[in-house]
Amino acid sequence: MVFSSLPIEEIRGELMEALRVPSPRILLKAPTGSGKSTGVPPMMDDAGLGDRGLIVVVQPRRMAARLLARHVARLRGVELGKEVGYAVRFERYISSRTRIAYVTDGMLERWLTEWPSLEGVSAVVFDEFHERSLSGDLSLGRVLDLQEGPRRDLAVVVMSATLEISGLREYMGGSCRVLEAQGRQYPVEVVYRAPRLVSDGRGRVAPPPIWEQAADVVREAVREDDCGDVLVFMPGVYEIRKTVELLAGKPWMSGRDVFPLYGSLAPEQQNCAVERGDIPRVIVSTNVAETSLTIEGVRTVVDSGLVRRSGWDPYRGMDTLHLVKISKASAAQRAGRAGRVAP
């Protein structure tokens, strides 16, 4: 399969050159939708790293690892688990023939514990590193230490869409090569929709639940002939289920499929949401569709502006999920999903 249609192809020559030096360290900055997750690992395989060992691509989410492996295997025309595979908790599609493996940061951390020298691994690629995690940060430090010690043949690549790279470049050392690729982005019109206010029956007014607000905007969007597939961002599984249930019962949704998309969903259902069919779709997703995955056919994005994020709760003495507003950078990333195929 030829990946020449991906914007990331513009840095192929630079990447090949950077991989030829001893103990290569590469920091790659490329926007969401540039094809770095699906394009860079095959380029590294073309450079001969797959002949020397496994190219490990670290993802922050299980769903991303699973779907990316399936997508790359399909693009290369190979069976999943043979040349291209993945390993996440409770699932392992890797064989002795595997050259590219998509794994979670937790899985890499486990491998580093079981095989401290990462025998049989030729390269480690940290994808979506801007989605920082303790496990990912620790694993990067251990891999860099390993490269400075017994594994000087190991290639280390860190890829990010939005991260400020100056500090990371300094941490990775003076030998780190910085590459930057451009994305392919059509103009996107951003419209803020203030929620309608409804009475609570006691003389007070308040916005309706966010799934009702989202349904109002989706109804307006699908009236347009050129709205394409619609991607709705919700903060969590509960809100996604309520939104899907509400949309599925609307008569104006006739002729459109509606799919949920989140990490704990069954793999078969995730595939249905991501793979494009003949019927227009409305996909209701968590922030996994913000950077980790590119869903083809999306021309309209409905953003709740919220996310559930893990954080320390001093009253409970444990990590819990907090409902918070997204950052300006995240809002731009979500809006940009509407500009991948057309204005």
Q: Residues of each region from the PLM?
A:
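P-loop NTPase motor module signature
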Residues: 1-343
